[in-house]
């Protein structure tokens, strides 16, 4: 029985794998060119908040670093899914913005190779987290979301006025070749609102 199970694992094709190192530097160079705003003090690239952002200050940008990189075959082509996350950074004060209501940022880049060069085909972002930070790097999971679509998901939570809401936050490609974001609430606890019944 153990041999049969082992053979099944060997025979099954790997649909998604960690990206090979030989292309990683080339992919990161393409993304660095997209950002084109390095912040040497934190060894990151600066990104503006999304257009639909609720960020109150014009001074806030995000200090982005690579978190995950996976290769899949999508619609018959080798495709890279690269996730960057970053903390909120106050450009005027030159410090991390760590207010409770400040979120971090997650950005998904989808790249395809043409004529031996990687190019960004889709890009999308979402504000996520609290205290100026996104979900921890280890929290992000690579998931398949449909026959030819993949993305990343992480759990995040926010507490305000004693009420904590927990959610699964997705960034993924859809059949229209766009990056979508989705939030599924999977927990709520308002016990602190009532003083934990003390």
Regions found by a protein language model. Give the residues of each.
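Short beta-strand edge/turn micro-motifs at domain boundaries
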Residues: 111-131, 178
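Hydrophobic h-region of N-terminal signal peptides that target proteins for export
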Residues: 10-18
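Signature of short aromatic-glycine-proline-rich micro-motifs recurring in repeat-based ectodomains
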Residues: 56-72, 134-142, 198
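Beta-propeller blade signature
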Residues: 101-113, 167-175
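Sec-dependent signal peptide recognition
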Residues: 2-8
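Short aromatic loop motif centered on NTY/YTY
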Residues: 127-168, 177-198
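Short beta-strand elements that form the blades of beta-propeller/WD-repeat-like
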Residues: 80-86, 90-92, 96, 149-157
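Short Lys/Arg-enriched alpha/beta "domain-start" segment
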Residues: 19-55
């Amino acid at each position: 029985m153990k041999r049969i199970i082992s053979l099944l694992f060997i025979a099954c094709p790997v649909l998604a794998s960690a990206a090979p190192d030989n292309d990683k530097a080339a992919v990161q160079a393409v993304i660095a060119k997209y950002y084109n705003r390095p912040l040497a003090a934190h060894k990151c690239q600066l990104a503006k908040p999304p257009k639909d952002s609720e960020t109150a200050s014009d001074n806030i940008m995000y200090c982005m670093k690579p978190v995950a990189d996976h290769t899949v075959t999508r619609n018959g082509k080798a495709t890279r899914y690269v996730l960057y996350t970053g903390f909120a950074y106050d450009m005027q004060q030159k410090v991390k913005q760590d207010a409770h209501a400040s979120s971090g940022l997650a950005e998904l880049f989808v790249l395809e190779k043409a004529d031996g060069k990687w190019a960004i085909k889709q890009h999308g972002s979402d504000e996520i987290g609290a205290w100026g930070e996104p979900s921890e790097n280890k929290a992000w999971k690579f998931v398949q979301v449909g026959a030819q679509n993949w993305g990343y998901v992480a759990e995040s939570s926010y507490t305000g006025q004693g009420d904590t809401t927990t959610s699964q936050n997705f960034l993924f490609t859809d059949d229209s070749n766009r990056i979508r974001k989705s939030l599924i609430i999977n927990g709520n606890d308002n016990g602190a609102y009532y003083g934990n019944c003390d």
